[in-house]
Amino acid sequence: MELKTIEFIKEHEENWRELLKDIPYCLTINENDNYAIFKYSQTGSDFNEQICKECRGLIIDKNILKPIALSFYKFFNYGEQFADKIYWKDCKVQEKVDGSKMLVWYDAYENKWQISTSSQLNAYEAKVQDFNITFGQLFDKALINNNLTNNDFYNLLDKKFCYTFELVSPESRVVIPYKQADLYFIGVRNIETFEECNTLDFMDICNKIKTPKQYPLNNLKACLHATECMGYDEEGFVVVDSRFNRVKIKSPAYVSAHHLKNNSTVNQSRILNIIENGEQEEFLTYFPEYKEYFVTIEDKLVEYKNNLKLAIEDINFKMEHNDPCLPWTRKDFAKYINQTYPQYSSMLFKYMNMDLINLFIDNQWSKLSKEDKMKKLGLKYEQEEE
């Protein structure tokens, strides 16, 4: 079956570039003399359109209008509108590697293997942000770290297939820190049939390059529970079934870390949430670059709580020493609080309205077992029938 993208180009030979760059597709297109690579926009592309799902680094030969390379179609987090339906009886739950997708494919015009990113045909021209290095150079470093030369690596490959790898490195870090440049073998596609293949059928590569860890999980509930137990050094899972349907299941900790920066601005509310959950020590183990932000916000939190405590002590003192000859009314206390402690007024009003002794008693009583409650009341405890 022909790709929708190819069909569209054939139907709009004169202006396919302009149309595909415009809504509803909003594709980025990069070209050289023979090839074009297509990448969707995460925010602009309409994923109701199959074309947008296909264009996740799709490479076509412009001369013959044939797809030359593609890793996976766009896939989504479970629960999202466009997420694939997974056949759980026959699926694999794999580690979600937190890296950059790299596509390796054979160039028949140049008679050599090429390495592309998801948006650039030549990975050696794709600069890593904030570093004087390209993704192609990082790929080479990763091969060296796996004791492979480029020739050794290319000798493992078959021209009838295109191959997908996940590249991780300190320089190209997304969220999770990796100590050195490395590769994970994550996908293969037959370019003659354009059907996806099982990576485990390519053991020559699997024996030389890492593959994602696999987990003995076979349902959504088990996967969700497992992600809740993950730390900040794991992204989550990719679930792929025998039909190559895929969904992502990300850990809450990873999502929190990933969204810690919004448009290069640190999200202070997320830092506060991590502090309140008591997870700052674990978080800073993996992301020490955020320490000064945590110190600042934690100091502000401690200061706020200490000042609130002093305000409560002041109100308690005034309530206990209220002059019986000229007593303060609730209105007088409200006026004093609003004038003296405007930042804490809502909490102080709630405090004054609380019956703290009974609140404490009720809280502790609710924690007792039925047997303990009966004993404390001097009553006989009888086991209830199920």
Map each language-model feature to its residues.
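Core nucleotide-handling region used for phosphoryl-transfer chemistry
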Residues: M1-E386
